[in-house]
Amino acid sequence: MKNIAIGILGAATLGLMASAASASTLDTVKAKGFIQCGVSTGLAGFSAPDDKGDWQGLDADFCRAVAAAVFGDGTKVKFTPLSAKERFTALQSGEVDVLSRNTTWTINRDTALGLNFVGVTYYDGQGFMINAKKLPGVNSALQLSGAAVCVQSGTTTELNLADYFKANKMEYNPVVFEKLEEVNAAYDAGRCDVYTTDQSGLYAIRLTLGSPADHVVLPEIISKEPLGPAVRQGDDQWYHIVKWTYFALLQAEELGITKANVDEMKNSPNPEIKRVLGQEADTKIGTDLGVSNDWVVNIVKAVGNYGEIFDRNVGSGSPLKIARGINALWTKGGLQYSPPIR
């Protein structure tokens, strides 16, 4: 879900940002010995605590990848659950070092909030879920005129919903809540006919409902929701480390480097693989970035490549079973693409 920044940042917020940016994030992180990662309050497949209280998901694993790049140890990360309303302030103030919380990259957030998005870890789009028993025969969002629709307030989801119904000359009754947990509970209790959010979120939320099989995700996608991690503006070194961690995950998948074979691949005769894994004698890619030259080895050992992260958290190896689709590599018809690591 995505919070909308309304109005102009106040002087107090700007002061917090200036204070947070006064020291190098890398130095601060190294001094405390871990990365503080802002995640959701609980979204299956992306960031949610398991039965042992350990955070799991694509967004959580991305922060582990950053920790592995910096420390050589993917466990050196602590997670801070943040609501949609809290997330940007937490990053601006320095409460978290990285925000990896199913957040949509928009022009306002990129230019007005003092944030830098590092890439798109998940290409998503807004969709609709219905209780098929309450709305028998409905198989398209264009059949939802007059429906009560549950939605989280202060989000791009809320705005997209209004635009979609207006554009299609339909009426609807918005049932609005501030917290995601409240939206989930209201929909499950039957207070609305329809639930709208990112389609990936709908698949995750469906698993938590009382009777998951009764609920159907409709085929329409009504928006572009490029979800990705963000860092504070003003610290280029930290931005580069986090950004190239994302690209390293993609490059590892493209080159066939996995958690299981990364040590073996260090002996590959392929010059590109040797360069990416820091095995060339004169390589300084890692040290120029501010980490060790075997930073990609450490990342892959900790979490695997991008494809492995996707599959176990949201894809074929997860309860969500979401197809790769446009999140496949560019070589397989998708949008995921890394610039050269050289």
Q: What is the predicted role of each segment?
A:
Residues 1-8:
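Bacterial N-terminal signal peptides that target proteins for export
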Residues 16-23:
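Sec/Tat signal peptide C-region and signal peptidase I cleavage site
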Residues 28-100, 284, 291, 299-306, ...:
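Extracytoplasmic small-molecule ligand-binding "clamshell" domains
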Residues 30-31, 67-75, 92-96, 104, ...:
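Sec-exported extracytoplasmic/periplasmic mature domains
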Residues 36-45, 55-70, 124-182:
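Bilobed "Venus flytrap"/periplasmic-binding protein-like clamshell domains
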Residues 61-64, 68-70, 132-135, 142, ...:
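Extended ligand-binding regions for polar small-molecule ligands
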Residues 64, 68, 72, 76-143, ...:
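Acidic, polar ligand-binding/catalytic clefts
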Residues 278-342:
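C-terminal functional modules
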